[in-house]
Amino acid sequence: MATYVNNLRLKEITTGDEDGTWGTSTNTNLELIADSLGYNTQDCFGSDGNQTTTIADGSADPARALYFKVTSTATLSTTRELTIAPNTVSRVMWIENATTGSQTITIKQGSGATVNIPTGQTKVLYLDGAGSGAAVVDANANVAADGVTSVAGTGTVNGLTLTGTVTSTGNLTLGGTLSGVSLTAA
């Protein structure tokens, strides 16, 4: 009997099974691998309530995608939870909150840590697949950048610590409390 215990929910054919038909299962698995590296959209919130999306065993499913755009036909009235099942899947996902109602969605997998994604934002997450206690973690929460880093546009940064020389071309607006700052005009 085939099983689906892997992280991509692919069909694992038992030795000796599917004599003469294994090619169909293999082709489906290859299509699902391609799906897992792509982009997909799913209306996860057809109603204004917490929801679960399940990565299907051995068949196409939007939640299998690496980049997963979450939408809603319902207007969300408050922060809503989206549980990604099964809770044994360990993987990395980019999840975009494209829901209506200007609400945050909370991504969860089990009773462990969760990640909030504000409306209009995308986060890179990893699901640890630890079963009932599974956690979802923001993969970029503690990213360090060495060397030259360039940022364009307008943004808000909280809790920023800079060391070394910081060069700005254009306007730089700082607020809050500054300490130990030495400014040099170019």
Predicted regions and their residues:
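Extracellular beta-strand-rich, repetitive "passenger/adhesive" scaffolds
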Residues: A130-G133
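Tight coil/turn sites that cap or link beta-strands
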Residues: T119-T122
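Exposed extracellular interaction/assembly regions and N-terminal maturation sites
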Residues: M1-R9, I13-I105, A186
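Short acidic-glycine-tyrosine-enriched beta hairpin
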Residues: A113-I117
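Short beta-strand micro-motifs enriched in acidic
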Residues: Y126-D128, T165
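Residues within well-ordered beta-strands of beta-sheet-rich folds
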Residues: W94, V124-Y126
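Surface-exposed, low-helix, low-complexity loop/repeat segments of extracellular attachment proteins
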Residues: G46-N50, S59, Y67-T73, Q103-K108, ...
